């Protein structure tokens, strides 16, 4: 299997080398299948990008698979102090990149394309949640 690097992730494509260093400062973690990455109610400190594998976001009857190049936990960045709203666990063995709030805030200042990509994805998720498509 070819491992995905942060620069391969569409959301992060085209960012400067300096910004890429900020992104990777949060660290990459290998997560075994079944392991819980976040619980609803946990404090949110940042977002995660799935580099390999699949994680599932579980909230009530909603189960949303986030696969390679996808991300989760972004609400913690957009609404400071907000707790996690769902449980997230690895459906398969996975590699995730953590992006802490401080790094994300700096990225938004220097990389407007990141904000646009994030907004597009959030809008698509909202449409999917409301329409089922």
Predicted regions and their residues:
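Cyclic nucleotide-binding regulatory domains
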Residues: 30, 35-93
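Cyclic nucleotide-binding regulatory module and flanking cytosolic helices
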Residues: 1-33, 77-80
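A small-molecule sensor/coupling module
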Residues: 8, 15-18, 83-85, 102-133
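A short hydrophobic beta-strand segment most commonly corresponding to one strand
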Residues: 94-103
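Alpha-helix boundary recognition
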Residues: 7, 23-24, 51, 67, ...
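Residues at structural and domain junctions
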Residues: 5-9, 20, 39, 74, ...
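Structural motif
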Residues: 10-13, 70, 92, 112
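Short, flexible helix/strand-to-coil boundary loops that buttress conserved ligand/catalytic motifs
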Residues: 61, 70, 76, 100, ...
């Amino acid at each position: 299997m070819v491992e995905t690097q942060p620069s391969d992730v569409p959301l992060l494509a085209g960012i400067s080398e300096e910004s890429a260093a900020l992104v990777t400062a949060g660290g990459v973690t290998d997560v075994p299948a079944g392991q819980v990455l976040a619980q609803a109610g946990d404090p949110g400190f940042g977002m995660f990008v799935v580099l390999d594998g699949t994680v599932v976001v579980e909230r009530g009857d909603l189960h949303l698979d986030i696969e390679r190049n996808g991300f989760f936990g972004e609400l913690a960045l957009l609404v400071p102090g907000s707790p996690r709203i769902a449980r997230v666990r690895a459906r398969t063995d996975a590699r995730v990149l953590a992006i802490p709030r401080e790094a994300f805030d700096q990225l938004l200042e220097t990389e407007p394309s990141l904000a646009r990509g994030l907004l597009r994805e959030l809008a698509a998720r909202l449409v999917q949640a409301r329409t089922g498509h």
